[in-house]
């Protein structure tokens, strides 16, 4: 898949044949059988995958979002680890038939969250970050009371919010003068008056609409909440890397017959993202990122994943003076994979 740069079965097969010297026809069949192999239990794989990705972290922020594949009538619920390198790392996912969402969406979200809680190492603090599609007081209750997760979830601006002193307004009406942030501690939300830790309402000049965020925290500052919710966008960038035919690996443009096959394809995608991110981290540690950008800024221009993709394409003709240190650094990271503790700290 790394050789092909695509998630299409035939293209992965071509890449496998190229990398291993196989017959293209037989390589494509191997990939097809892999995706249909019932012996590959995604739930079992994710129980190992989640602790590996989390690594030595004691607290994590997890973005949750749906992405749809209209041509196949499927949708995937993705939970991704928010990182510092520009891309959210796939952590856990569940693909279902879109036709079942109307009556079962909450059940699917609950199922995925429970699977995450079961797979995580003990004593890991989790904060779920999600957009307006998840702004439901029932979900808030499940997260805090049952799963013991924190949350920062956006909700619609027309939802009623009651301040601690009893004053009630729509969420958008709580935005401060000039769009300034206003934090309401121990606020009540919705007509059911469900109590949350805090509500943040803000509309920066660059925002098309106000951000109305509900959080379980009673102490987080407005700046902290805004920065955390802003990182949620990295899951959208991850979807583009996976789905887009031009800028990514094209999953959104290929036909996948069943949700189970798509979940196995997501697993291959997660492995590819992990390896390419590690390659990008190895290159950046050696200062190779300055060869990949046209500007002279010292800050990171490309995500580690994008750096890994670019370096992988350059490897066949890379001079030995640059190639050998890169391979050695990458191999050193791979050597840590049995324990994963430090390796996945960067992923």
Sequence positions of predicted segments:
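Active-site-proximal, Lys/Arg-enriched surface segment
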Residues: 27-86, 90-92, 97
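Single, function-defining residue in the core of a domain
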Residues: 1-8, 46-47, 58, 71, ...
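Short, basic interhelical loop/turn and adjoining N-cap
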Residues: 16-30
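Nucleic-acid substrate recognition interfaces
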Residues: 2, 18, 37
């Amino acid at each position: 898949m790394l050789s092909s740069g695509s998630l299409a079965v035939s293209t992965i097969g071509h890449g496998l044949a190229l990398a291993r010297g196989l017959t293209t026809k037989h390589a494509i069949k191997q990939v097809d059988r892999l995706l249909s192999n019932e012996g590959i239990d995604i739930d079992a794989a994710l129980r190992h995958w989640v602790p590996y990705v989390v690594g030595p972290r004691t607290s994590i922020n997890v973005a949750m979002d749906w992405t749809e594949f209209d041509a196949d009538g499927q949708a995937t619920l993705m939970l991704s680890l928010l990182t510092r390198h520009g891309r959210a790392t796939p952590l856990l996912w569940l693909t279902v038939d879109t036709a079942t969402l109307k009556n079962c969406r909450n059940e699917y979200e609950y199922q995925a969250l429970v699977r995450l809680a079961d797979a995580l190492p003990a004593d890991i603090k989790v904060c779920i970050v999600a957009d307006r599609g998840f702004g439901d007081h029932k979900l808030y209750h499940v997260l805090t009371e049952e799963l013991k997760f924190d949350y920062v979830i956006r909700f619609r601006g027309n939802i009623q919010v009651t301040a601690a002193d009893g004053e009630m307004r729509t969420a958008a009406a709580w935005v401060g003068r000039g769009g300034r942030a206003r934090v309401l501690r121990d606020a009540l939300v919705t007509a059911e008056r469900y109590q949350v830790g805090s509500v943040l309402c803000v509309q920066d000049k660059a925002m098309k609409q106000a951000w109305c965020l509900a959080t379980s925290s009673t102490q987080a500052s407005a700046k902290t909440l805004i920065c955390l919710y802003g990182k949620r966008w990295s899951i959208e960038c991850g979807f583009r890397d996976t789905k887009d035919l031009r800028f990514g690996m094209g999953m959104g443009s290929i036909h996948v017959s069943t949700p189970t096959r798509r979940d196995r394809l997501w697993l291959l995608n997660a492995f590819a993202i992990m390896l390419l991110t590690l390659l990008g981290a190895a290159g950046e540690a050696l200062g190779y990122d300055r060869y990949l950008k046209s500007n002279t800024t010292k800050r990171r221009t490309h995500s580690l994943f994008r750096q890994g993709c670019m370096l992988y394409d350059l490897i066949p003709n890379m001079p030995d003076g640059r190639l050998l240190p890169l391979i050695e650094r990458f191999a050193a990271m791979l050597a840590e994979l049995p324990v994963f503790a430090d390796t996945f700290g960067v992923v």
